[in-house]
A protein has these predicted regions:
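Flexible "cap/lid" loop of the alpha/beta hydrolase fold
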Residues: 107, 111-112, 118-147
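Short beta-strand/loop motif that positions the catalytic acidic residue
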Residues: 206, 212-214
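Conserved alpha/beta-hydrolase "acid-adjacent" motif
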Residues: 219-225
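Catalytic active-site module of serine/aspartate enzymes centered on a nucleophile-bearing elbow/loop
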Residues: 235-276
């Protein structure tokens, strides 16, 4: 694994490149307030299968710059960061994917830059059915980050000093709890005020193969959202996870699904141009 960085619109963005020996790239993105640590196990497993996986810390997350201007944290701005990463890597087309926020960013990138996207892996996307639960969860967080800053500065400072664990997904949660209230407030505000997902018409126009991962009993990532998305995308397949944490704690089944999807996606296509 190699760590690199690049500048986009004056901001430094950091990524990790897991080169499994392939020139064909999967960019896999983290969820809201989390970072690349969340997906290290997935990247290791897929790289072991021969796939190249790049994990990007989106602006405000992980090791990337963290300004306090909410306008820089719109989901469409995040999609532009992904395209800038591909430009930096010299990659014409890649498979995009991620968890929650990462899934939505990948969808927006596919809608706005279809020429750069070879396929999609969409884990727990946040769509229309999630709006009430997301509002109940994120608005109090936004208010707490704004009005409870003195206390949150203390708790985030303390959390940043806690030693990290051998569990990368847990470390990602700890990193999220270490964010300053100013940055957290800016991220939440920016994500909430901008477009969250492409329109239904745009989704129906995304023709690349897609794998949609979903589970039940989750208000912020409801199964109905994932099922509807899989029906709206012309070339999508829905895979049901046993739990929200399966891909992080018991990943063997789902990483095989991901690996098979990538292998099929990049497999040479038969030449249909030849005549009898």
């Amino acid at each position: 694994m190699k760590t690199g960085s690049f500048e986009h619109r004056g901001r430094r963005l950091v990524y990790d490149d897991y080169d499994g020996g392939s020139s064909r790239v999967l960019v896999y993105l983290h969820g809201l307030l989390l970072d690349a640590e969340l997906n290290r196990g997935i990247a290791d497993a897929l790289a072991a299968q021969g796939h190249r996986v790049v994990l990007l810390d989106l602006l405000g997350h992980g090791r990337s710059d963290a300004p306090t201007h909410a306008s820089e944290y719109r989901i469409d701005s995040y999609a532009e960061q992904v395209v800038a990463l591909l430009d930096h890597l010299g990659v014409d087309r890649a498979v995009l994917g991620g968890l929650s926020l990462g899934a939505n960013v990948s969808l927006v990138a596919a809608a706005e830059h279809p020429e750069r996207v070879r396929g999609l892996i969409l884990e727990m996307p946040v769509m229309e059915w999630a709006v009430p639960a997301a509002a109940m969860a994120f608005v109090p967080m936004l208010l707490a980050a704004h009005y409870g800053r003195p206390l949150l500065r203390i708790t985030s400072s303390l959390m940043s000093r806690v030693p990290r664990t051998p569990l990368s997904a847990l470390n990602s949660v700890m990193d999220a709890a270490s964010l300053s209230p100013e940055v957290m407030s800016s991220i939440l505000h920016g994500v909430l005020v901008g477009p969250v997902v492409p329109t239904t018409e745009q989704r129906e126009g995304i023709g690349v193969p897609a794998l949609v991962l979903a589970h039940t009993h989750d208000l912020i990532h409801p199964f109905n959202d994932a099922r509807n998305l899989a029906e709206q995308l012309p070339a999508a397949r829905l895979v049901r996870a046993h739990s929200p944490l399966e891909l992080r704690l018991q990943p063997e089944r789902l990483t095989r699904e991901l690996g098979d999807f990538l292998a099929e996606l990049w497999a040479p296509r038969p030449d249909v141009s030849s005549s009898d």
